[in-house]
Amino acid sequence: MTQPVTPTIFTVSRLNQTVRQLLELEMGQIWLSAEISNLSQPASGHWYFTLKDDKAQVRCAMFRNSNRRVTFRPQNGQQVLVRASITLYESRGDYQLIAESMQPAGDGLLQQQFEALKQRLQAEGLFDVGHKQPLPSPARCVGVITSTSGAALHDVLHVLRRRDPALPVVIYPSAVQGGEAPGQLVRAIALANLRAECDVLIVGRGGGSLEDLWSFNDERVARAIFASHIPIVSAVGHETDVSIADFVADLRAPTPSAAAEVVSRNRDELLRRLLSQRQRLDMALDYTLARRRQRLQQLRHRLEQQHPQLRLARQQARLLSLHRRLEEAIDTQLRLAERRWRLGGERLQQRSPAHALRQQQYHLQQLSHRLESQLQRSVAARRERFGALCSRLEGMSPLATLARGFSVTQRDDGQLLRHREQVAPGDTLRTRLEDGWVESQVTATRPLTARRPRGTKGSA
């Protein structure tokens, strides 16, 4: 005979405890997409709110050590993606969620990424008015970078034909939506700059959702627009749509048709200039407001940590930038090597033996002419100096003195007679005249008492 099964009898507290354990063990952590409502942020720093959809709702708590990692400020009515654990509040028998992380869902996440990239590029100066290039007036050729199958191209061509049918237009096809679009837009801008056949570019597309327009919020596209040597007019979506490309471009047009109006010639040129100045003022105002928002954002989130996805995006962007810089450095080195090779060939040709021999022959001829001329001048100078020395020597010769009527008297021992004390009566003297000698004998010596008349020669 079968024994009756004794039923398990629970108390309320044990039941709630068992249910809590089952929920925590079986469910673990889950991801939940829902809308925030009844958000409460008391002074304790914890967050309490309700997550709901159109049919149900559940209470949720997010403690301070978890919500400090949230990179945005949640608000009622906002769609979010929450990672949470399920638990049961045993004393009341209510189950709730304990949130570990939170991020915007759908367009909210894209908007957060948009603001982060905008702040970073703005801090780098890519939005500065000083970098804006003036549009040509009038434009000689217009380039259009957009999809060939979109309505934007049709609108641009229609306006250009209506306003200035003779204006040349070059189309650079590119995808404007999807994963391939940013790369194609970058390559189209680079191609237009390489070919340099247009003096202004229109980059844009028709309207759409934030996700549809996301290619124009790509950092690669923004940097390509900033690096363009050709002025760029952005024309993305409708007037209410704002993209990163609008901030970086030299001028923002609210629609592709408006962009065609701006770049084409019109009878009323003043209107185009007025629109240009208005756009510059709008850009300056947007820049000022963006800086204010950035400052407010910094003050609001200075204790919050950066989201890992943003950090990963920056690393990926840096990797792409380094890759581009490496390619540019390699190209530069190749060009420098080619230039050095050409210069080396020219130097080698200049240093060839035939070239050196011709230079030496020419130099030798120059030296020969210089030597001959210098030798002639030297001989003439030496002849002149020789004549002068001969004249001086002749003037200083004793024979010349004798020829003027003077004489030289010597004693018999050859000593020249200068004073009367050198002789005595009876000494023999020799006097040298111009044409010979005279010998005489001293009979007496007398001192000079008076000056003798000029022309009288003395005698011993």
From Swiss-Prot:
Coiled-coil intervals, chain numbering: none
A GO CC term assigned to this protein in UniProt: cytoplasm
UniProt KW keywords: Cytoplasm, Exonuclease, Hydrolase, Nuclease
Location relative to the cell: Cytoplasm
Main location, first listed in the record: cytoplasm
Lineage: superkingdom: Bacteria
GO terms under biological process: DNA catabolic process
This enzyme's EC code(s): 3.1.11.6
Known catalytic reactions: Exonucleolytic cleavage in either 5'- to 3'- or 3'- to 5'-direction to yield nucleoside 5'-phosphates
First-tier enzyme category under EC: hydrolase
CDD domains (alphabetical): ExoVII_LU_OBF
Gene Ontology MF annotations: exodeoxyribonuclease VII activity; nucleic acid binding
HAMAP family per record: Exonuc_7_L
Family: Belongs to the XseA family.
Oligomer status and interactors: Heterooligomer composed of large and small subunits.
Annotated function: Bidirectionally degrades single-stranded DNA into large acid-insoluble oligonucleotides, which are then degraded further into small acid-soluble oligonucleotides.
Name of this chain's protein: Exodeoxyribonuclease 7 large subunit
Species name: Edwardsiella ictaluri (strain 93-146)
Higher taxonomy: Bacteria, Pseudomonadati, Pseudomonadota, Gammaproteobacteria, Enterobacterales
